């Protein structure tokens, strides 16, 4: 997990760039590290950042308790809450409803994120307790590639000639993990913020100098497969699925770019 000093370092470095206006705390579950998360919010707000927190709401056992969890950051945080069949047994998870009720009472901005689920018998609701629900496609990378892709509808691998999920030439966001890796897409590292200042990593970013990003920018996952003459299946669920499968085969050849291990399902 991050230390407070590491978080402060990233925030200060991000401020130096002059192009970053918002910080999102997500991945795993931020509320599992509650005191660190609250402090991180405070530090981000001091520097003038807009702050978003993404959560599955395991902590919202009832609206009253949810208010206690949210109160220390109610004035400074926008909430994005996950509610779908990948996080519960229905589109509308009880704990998410509790969190929305609490957030509304505290005048917090809140939205719901839901991922399409092909086996759902009922349509996804347009709102939960008055909070708008955004419905998004599942991206088949990471665990989704290994656990869910087998049952997905598939297309020819040759159709995936661009990366539609991330802007790789002029990124509008990056992901920073507790090991310091800076990713333009989860699992594709452009540097390590514990080894090189974050602001320098971003200011010196050039996808055409990166062995993995160069083909992805030029022709998507298809170009990545062709550049390295990788073995492949004929059909994949989406571009992320093909890209992830290709990157798994390239990890030993590009260890500085394709890491850390946890991004590829490897745990010590």
Language-model regions, residue ranges each:
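Core AdoMet radical
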Residues: 1-2, 19-33, 47-62, 73-95, ...
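Short, acidic/polar
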Residues: 3-11, 62-70
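Short Fe-S-cluster ligation motifs
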Residues: 10-28, 264-268
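Acidic (Asp/Glu)-rich catalytic clusters
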Residues: 12-18, 41-46, 67-76, 98-105
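Radical SAM enzyme [4Fe-4S]-AdoMet core and its adjacent flexible, acidic
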Residues: 71-208
């Amino acid at each position: 997990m991050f230390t407070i000093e590491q978080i402060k370092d990233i925030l200060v470095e991000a401020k130096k760039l002059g192009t970053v206006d918002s910080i999102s705390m997500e991945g795993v579950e931020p509320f599992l590290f509650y005191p660190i998360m609250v402090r991180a919010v405070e530090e981000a707000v001091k520097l003038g950042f807009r702050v978003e927190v993404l959560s599955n709401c395991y902590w919202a056992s009832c609206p009253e308790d949810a208010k206690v969890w949210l109160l220390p950051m109610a004035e400074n945080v926008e909430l994005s809450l996950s509610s779908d069949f990948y996080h519960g047994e229905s589109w509308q998870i009880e704990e998410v409803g509790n969190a929305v009720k609490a957030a509304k009472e505290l005048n917090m901005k809140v939205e719901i994120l839901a991922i399409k689920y092909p086996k759902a018998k009922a349509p996804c609701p347009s709102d939960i307790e008055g909070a708008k629900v955004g419905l998004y496609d599942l991206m088949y990378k990471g665990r989704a590639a290994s656990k869910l892709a087998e049952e997905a509808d598939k297309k020819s691998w040759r159709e995936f000639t661009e990366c539609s999920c991330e802007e790789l030439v002029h990124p509008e966001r990056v992901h920073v993990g507790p090991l310091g890796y800076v990713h333009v897409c989860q699992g594709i590292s452009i540097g390590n913020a514990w080894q090189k200042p974050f602001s320098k990593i971003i200011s010196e970013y050039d996808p055409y100098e990166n062995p993995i990003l160069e083909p992805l920018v030029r022709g998507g996952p298809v170009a990545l497969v062709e550049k390295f003459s990788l073995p492949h299946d004929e059909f994949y669920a989406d571009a992320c699925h093909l890209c992830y499968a290709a990157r798994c085969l390239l990890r030993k050849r590009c260890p500085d770019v394709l890491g850390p291990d946890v991004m590829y399902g490897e745990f010590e």
